[in-house]
Design a protein with these regions (language model features):
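Substrate-binding cleft of carbohydrate-active enzyme catalytic domains
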Residues: 1-147
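Short, solvent-exposed coil/turn linker segments
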Residues: 20, 71, 126, 214-215, ...
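Short, well-ordered coil/turn elements that cap or connect secondary structure elements
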Residues: 33, 144, 161, 180-182, ...
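Solvent-exposed, flexible loop/coil residues
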Residues: 48, 52-55, 59-62, 74-76, ...
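Flexible, acidic glycine-rich loops studded with aromatic residues
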Residues: 148-154, 159-164, 169-313
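Disordered, acidic Ser/Thr/Pro-rich linker "stalks" and the adjacent N-terminal cap
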Residues: 311-332
Length: 332
């Protein structure tokens, strides 16, 4: 607290927990001892409702609870981001700083006088270009601090910043496009790597964001197929599993969602496709799950999995003669 710019005790707009600086340093050091690098993510310009509730002057409307995105036409937005990122850089020694960049609504920018002025001054054709303008400016700031910018694949929209690394979540296409353009990429396609998705029959599983990523589906990912070519494959750094916690209120629930699917994602990351063997992997997973359960952890009980059940979508009789029919797998 004290003279910190954006942290105020008893702010009525503040809710939930927080980390003290010393606690963050403790987490970073603990991870370092385990050879893990903690990469912080400060979301921008979208997913900013909580910022705009407290600092409504950074919204296009100037009001709280109206806009979802930071106002890019407002120079104060960039001052705010620089100050926040400066504190983050001080606390996290990671080479990369993740700036989010995903799911910006952008609707308010199209009618915001300040954003439209910014677009005209910078020769930007559309709101995608406006987001790209922000990403470029933030990258210049991070590079000046000796750090590199990492963002979700939406940062491709409007033109990718020169040194940006792309984390591809809406499929693999964004990561492939970035790699072909000479940028590094991390593959984390949601249909393989999202651990907040249900992993089995949702009628038997706890709440989840969506369905359906089985252990076998996660294991089947090929993040860097040889068909991409010798110039592209080296630009793909690896894979990442994501657990978003809107529907995961407890540590036990988190363990259930993570394990054993994170084992599949890890093995995808370090294994050549021709060396992968799902049957062998599955047998090892059953042993690992039993080991976890014996020690009081809460993994998904893989031995009782229902699985994809492809036989349930084989058509037997259809009354729509001569009409196209699409069959979806259960829970998808």
């Amino acid at each position: 607290y004290g003279d910190r710019r954006y942290c105020h005790r008893d702010d009525p707009a503040a809710e939930g927990g927080y980390y003290m600086q010393e606690e963050i340093r403790e987490v970073v050091e603990y991870a370092r001892a385990l050879h893990i690098t903690v990469i912080p993510e400060i979301e921008m310009p979208g997913h900013s409702e909580e910022v705009l509730a407290t600092y409504p002057q950074l919204a296009c409307s100037g009001k709280p609870y109206v806009n979802k995105d930071l106002c890019i036409g407002n120079e104060e937005t960039f001052e705010f981001l620089k100050n926040v990122l400066s504190e983050v850089i001080e606390l996290f020694p990671s080479e990369y700083i993740h700036i989010g960049g995903d799911e910006a609504d952008k609707a308010s920018w199209a009618t915001c006088p300040r954003c439209r002025t910014r677009m005209r001054q910078e020769g930007l054709e559309d709101v995608d270009g406006l987001q790209s303008y922000l990403v470029h400016r933030v990258e210049v700031f991070l590079n000046g601090k000796g750090r590199r910018l990492l963002g979700w694949d939406e940062i491709l929209q409007g033109g990718l910043a020169p040194d940006a690394t792309v984390m591809s979540w809406r499929g693999s296409e964004g990561g492939i496009a970035a790699a072909r353009a000479g940028h590094q990429a991390v593959m984390t396609p949601n249909s393989y790597c999202y651990l907040d998705y249900c992993q089995d029959d949702p009628t038997r599983e706890p709440a989840a964001a969506a369905a359906f990523v089985t252990l076998e589906k996660a294991y089947s990912l090929d993040p860097a197929p040889d068909s991409l070519g010798v110039d592209v494959v080296p630009m793909i750094l690896g894979v990442q599993g994501n657990l978003w916690c809107e529907h995961v209120p407890t540590g036990e629930h988190a363990e259930h969602m993570i394990w054993p699917r994170l084992m599949a994602i890890a093995e995808v990351g370090w294994s050549l496709p021709e060396r992968k063997d799902y049957d062998d992997f599955h047998a090892r997973v059953l042993d690992a799950v039993a080991w976890m359960q014996e020690r009081g952890y809460h993994p998904f009980d893989q031995k009782n999995a229902v699985g994809d059940r492809p036989e349930s979508i084989e058509p037997v009789l259809c009354l729509s003669t001569g009409k196209p029919v699409v069959y979806h797998t259960p829970y998808s």
